[in-house]
Regions:
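Bacterial N-terminal signal peptides that target proteins for export
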Residues: 1-11
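Sec/Tat signal peptide C-region and signal peptidase I cleavage site
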Residues: 19-27
Length: 167
């Protein structure tokens, strides 16, 4: 159950980042997003050096919501993949990965993210836009996120992203 909560948490973080990239944002505008995600794949290897220490690869999917009521990234599909080094017994993890945000027309924004959780309920980190396709080609941005576990393999992530849209 712990691995699913962690998986959900990381997926949520990435999802939140994806939400920030869609819609009617202005150049240099900060966008507030919420991503709700669920884990779809999880593979782990026990490290063996201490109880609860594992390395895991996962995938998650979800939906982005623009918390400012704008169209940018609102309702976009989000897919995330990541690598996690975690200790379920200690309640800590560090992770990094990639996200793919897809708008209603099929154009995409790709992101990279990293973060950690140190014995608290939430994880936090940073993200950055790698590139966009179609109308999002040339988009740039970076931001922060906080992920919160919900139930089982589901979580949500709140983030803020400063975006510069393509010209």
């Amino acid at each position: 159950m712990f691995k699913f909560k962690i998986f959900a948490f990381i997926t949520l973080m990435t999802f939140a980042f994806g939400i920030a990239l869609v819609g009617d944002a202005l150049a240099g505008e900060k966008v507030k997003l919420r991503s709700v995600m669920y884990g779809t794949k999880w593979e782990q290897i026990n490290v063996g050096d201490e109880e609860g220490h594992v390395i895991a690869v996962y995938e998650a999917k979800g939906i982005d919501t623009n918390m400012q009521g704008k169209k940018f990234m609102d309702g976009w599909l989000y897919r995330e993949s990541g690598l996690m080094d975690m200790n379920g017994k200690a309640g800590t993890w560090s992770a990094q990965g990639y996200g793919e945000c897809t708008d209603r027309d099929g154009d995409k924004i790709f992101i990279t993210w990293e973060g950690k959780k140190d014995k608290k309920e939430t994880g936090e980190g940073t993200n950055a836009i790698l590139k966009g396709t179609g109308k999002w080609q040339g988009i740039q941005g970076k931001g922060t996120w906080v992920a919160v576990p919900a139930v089982d393999n589901r979580w949500y992530s709140d983030g803020e992203l400063e975006v510069e849209l393509p010209r």
